[in-house]
Structures are given as structure tokens and as C-alpha cells.
A protein has these predicted regions:
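Structured catalytic/nucleic-acid-binding cores of DNA maintenance enzymes
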Residues: 1-195
Length: 195
């Protein structure tokens, strides 16, 4: 931000640079934390970083390795995708989009997938994340999730299920998207297209 830019609501920390500009930590939901550490200290000082799982964008893996990871813990597919100790960086929005794209329900158990379904889930995971990055992520109606320059993303206009409850499924056109609660989080899916 430029120093003259108005300070947004929920700005918790502002760092002003000597050569101009500011870095602002804006956290409306107060999920975030800020730490100061050297590169060598970062994982020892910030315990959460040492337990992060694989980053599927920065460190691609084979679908076979993904399958081993998937089967290493018995849980629902949505819980697996959003478990940061397994795969880093996938939140609620992208978990729903990945599951829809792969044709799999959120409540399927990790151990129930066939080899073909594992390959499909992995392909969807990679493709959805890269597509979301291409469109600068998802900026929802509350204006959250913008880039470092305050520019909104546009992937939300490509959402197939997330935040589209009671709207027709874009794939089957026979059913409306359903919204349910799972672990206190909204989950969106198509009862026809996802098995």
C-alpha cells in the first residue's frame, strides 16, 4: 500500500518501509498470526510451519505418492484435503471445487477410493489450484483475499459449487447445488455429480 492509502478495517499490523510504501496485515477473521524470524529459525520458531504437509504447487508429487499420502490416514475426503499437515494451502473453497471437479463426495472415506478415483482426485487438485492461481484466487463478496497490491482475484466467477447453493449444477443441470455443514464449515456439492 502507499502510505497515503486509507487504513482498512481489521488492519492489525502496519510496516512502513524507508523507501516508501507499507505492508499491512489485514485479518478480519483473526485466523492469522505474524512472526519475526530469520530464515534459519523459521521452522523452529514457528512450530506450525514445521508440521505443514506437502505444497502441491511448489513441490509436485506423483499421483502414486499422493495415493500413499491419501491412504495413510482414515478420514473423509474433505477433512483430508483441508488437513494442513497432509497438504498445505487447501482451504474450504478449493476443497469443494476439487471434489466437485473429481466427481467425489466430501464425506467419502480416503480408503474407499479406487485407483482411478485417486488419479482423478489428484488431477483435479493440481488443475484447480493452478487455475485458481491463474485467476489470482477467489475474492468473495466480503472483499477478503486480495493480493499484496490489493487487487481482487477472479476465480470466484469460475466456482462450480462453492457459494452456489440452490443454483443449478453447471455439469448435470438436473440438480441444484446443496449446502451443508461439516465440522462447522459450509460444504457445497451436487448430489448427482458427486459419488
Amino acid at each position: 500500500n502507499a502510505i497515503k492509502d486509507p487504513v482498512e478495517k481489521h488492519t492489525h499490523v502496519t510496516i512502513t518501509f524507508t523507501q516508501g510504501g507499507q505492508l499491512r496485515f489485514v485479518d478480519p477473521r483473526t485466523f492469522g498470526e505474524m512472526f519475526l524470524a530469520t530464515p534459519d529459525e523459521i521452522t523452529s520458531e514457528i512450530e506450525e510451519l514445521s508440521s505443514l504437509g506437502v505444497d502441491p504447487v511448489e513441490t509436485p508429487m506423483s499421483w502414486v505418492d499422493f495415493g500413499h499420502l491419501l491412504r495413510s490416514k482414515s478420514q473423509s475426503l474433505k477433512a483430508f484435503l483441508t488437513d494442513q499437515s497432509m497438504i498445505a494451502g487447501i482451504g474450504n473453497i478449493y476443497a469443494d471445487e476439487i471434489l466437485f471437479d473429481s466427481g467425489l463426495r466430501f464425506d467419502r472415506e480416503t480408503g474407499s477410493l479406487t485407483t482411478q478415483e485417486i488419479r482423478r482426485l489428484y488431477r483435479s487438485l493440481v488443475e484447480i489450484l493452478h487455475e485458481a492461481i491463474k485467476y489470482n484466487g477467489s475474492t468473495l463478496s466480503d472483499g477478503q483475499y486480495v493480493d499484496l497490491f490489493g487487487k481482487a482475484g477472479d476465480y470466484q466467477s469460475h466456482h462450480q459449487v462453492y457459494n452456489r447453493d440452490k443454483q443449478p449444477c453447471r455439469r448435470c443441470r438436473r440438480n441444484d447445488i446443496v449446502k451443508t455443514k461439516v465440522a462447522s464449515r459450509s460444504t457445497f456439492y451436487c448430489e448427482v455429480c458427486q459419488v
